[in-house]
């Protein structure tokens, strides 16, 4: 296994400008760099995900890892207000050409990239020049949410399903040409792309990623990989790494990849379903309780808080104009603000798990999130919403079984059907503003408004074409 550390979700003290802090980080990085160099690694990618859902990077030679860990690598604050097309907006707190931040690699999550010989990758946290946490750092926001749960004696385990469409390589303006036309979920797709899928499994394994399933999905050329649950920040890191890996393996096979919510309008899109379970000690609060389907009271209140905030959460979990080409009824996208046991049309699907499988089986799935989401924003905001529900001792409404679209109109509330509607809910969410803090909250708001304006008047086909190869 190539990951330097298998730590799931460690909490890190914020690095400071102290000589002792820099020396400690430098010593760890020096040892890590020596090991990487001996393994043939020449460069290290430091990555973070911006508010439009795009992974941005800086790279350093392996000999520069020590300096990067001690002092950071410069990056402009304006990355917080980049749009999906690389244009830049501004917000009340963040934007403009002035200022600089430091990217500090998380050495506990550094991994040698199996599909990119000579390269390693590490997620980066962003700090101000004085060593204080950057208020717009999405990864540190997720960590703060985890810490807020831990102060209540609670821990969470999470996993994000990664769905993607694979197509033959070609110019970015061209629509996808699929390398397999086999049936949805069909063995033909595995046969047609056998070597490709095998190389993916090998790369995941070499990087220490615990794959649960890899299988064809519904849309043309679509596949899904799901991984074992881990701490929420680690799960977000894993999602970024998995996407990198899929893209790298695909390129080696003459293929290109889209994680976009809508690759082709009218077809099933790429989801980013978030699975969460809430724990107190060794007890999974999603089972063996006295609430609905075995939920403990704390788990019910947590999920009720998530359900109540889902319209606002969509601005983070379904963040693009294209997201609402995917989020439609009767596509298993979770377009209704309801919950139900094993209901794939509900935005919040309760998964009790097979009887007798063990305490790790029960979890909840948020189905309305998609592949455009920044995973750190998604997990951090969902935790914040759940904790607000727990603090308010909310209860779940009546469950919904079957297809909500088959109910009388208005009986089951629809989630926002456009980014404009989601942004309106987000703007009014006191829970999310308090959790994210004004600088991050406002930066997200600025990006969403700017992308709404960017795609104003575009047809669904034009929106899909403009975003298809951006994610």
Can you say where each PLM-predicted feature lies in the sequence?
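ATP/Mg2+-dependent ligation/transfer catalytic cores
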Residues: 2-213, 411-471
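Active-site capping/gating regions of soluble enzymes
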Residues: 19-22, 26-35, 42-43, 47-150, ...
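Short secondary-structure transition/capping segments
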Residues: 56-57, 169-170, 224-226, 270-272, ...
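Core alpha/beta catalytic barrel or barrel-like domain that forms the active/cofactor pocket
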Residues: 157-168, 175-177, 184, 207-227, ...
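Glycine-rich tight-turn/loop motif centered on a GG-T
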Residues: 178-190, 228-236, 285, 290-292
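Long hydrophobic alpha-helices with heptad-repeat/coiled-coil character
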Residues: 212-232, 238-248, 316, 454-471
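Intrinsic-disorder/low-complexity, polar/charged segments
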Residues: 226, 231-232, 324, 342, ...
């Amino acid at each position: 296994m190539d990951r330097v550390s298998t730590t799931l979700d460690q909490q890190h003290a914020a690095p400071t400008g102290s000589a002792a802090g820099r020396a400690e980080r430098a010593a760890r990085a020096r040892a890590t760099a020596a090991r990487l160099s001996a393994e043939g690694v020449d460069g290290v990618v430091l990555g973070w995900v911006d508010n439009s859902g795009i992974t941005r990077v800086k790279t350093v030679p392996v000999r520069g890892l020590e300096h990067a860990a001690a002092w950071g690598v410069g990056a402009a604050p304006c990355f917080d207000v980049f749009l999906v097309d690389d244009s830049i907006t501004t917000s009340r707190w963040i934007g403009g050409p002035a200022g600089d931040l430091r990217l500090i690699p998380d050495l506990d999550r550094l991994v040698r990239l199996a599909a990119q010989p000579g390269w390693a990758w590490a997620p980066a946290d962003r700090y101000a020049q004085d060593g204080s946490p950057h208020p717009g750092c999405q990864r540190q926001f997720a960590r703060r949410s985890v810490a807020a749960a831990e102060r209540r004696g609670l821990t969470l385990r999470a996993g994000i399903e990664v769905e993607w469409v694979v197509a033959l390589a070609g110019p970015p303006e061209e629509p996808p040409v699929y390398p397999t036309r086999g049936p949805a979920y069909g063995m033909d797709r595995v046969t047609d792309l056998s070597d490709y899928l095998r190389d993916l499994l090998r790369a995941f394994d070499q990087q220490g990623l615990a794959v649960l399933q890899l299988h064809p999905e519904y849309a043309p050329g679509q596949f899904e990989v799901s991984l074992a649950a881990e701490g929420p920040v680690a799960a977000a890191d894993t999602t970024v790494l998995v996407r990198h890996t899929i893209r790298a393996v695909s390129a080696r096979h003459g293929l290109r990849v889209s994680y976009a919510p809508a690759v082709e309008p009218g077809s099933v899109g790429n989801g980013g379903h978030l699975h969460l379970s809430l724990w107190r000690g060794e007890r999974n609060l999603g089972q063996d309780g006295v609430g609905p389907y075995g939920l403990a009271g704390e788990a019910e209140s947590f999920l009720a808080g998530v359900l109540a905030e889902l319209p606002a959460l969509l601005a983070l979990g379904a963040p693009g104009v294209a997201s609402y080409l995917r989020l439609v009824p009767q596509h298993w996208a979770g377009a209704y603000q309801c919950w139900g046991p094993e209901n794939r049309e509900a935005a919040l699907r309760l998964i009790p798990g097979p009887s007798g499988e063990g305490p790790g089986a029960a979890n909840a799935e948020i189905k309305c999130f998609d592949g455009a989401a920044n995973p750190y924003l998604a997990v951090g905001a969902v935790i914040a919403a759940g904790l607000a529900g727990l603090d308010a001792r909310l209860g779940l409404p009546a469950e919904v079984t079957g297809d909500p679209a088959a109910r009388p109109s208005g009986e089951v509330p629809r989630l926002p059907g456009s980014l404009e509607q989601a942004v309106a809910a987000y703007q009014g969410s006191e829970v999310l503003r308090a959790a994210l803090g004004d600088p991050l909250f406002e930066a997200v708001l600025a990006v969403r408004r700017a992308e709404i304006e960017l795609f104003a008047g575009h047809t669904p086909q034009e929106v899909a074409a403009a975003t298809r190869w951006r994610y």
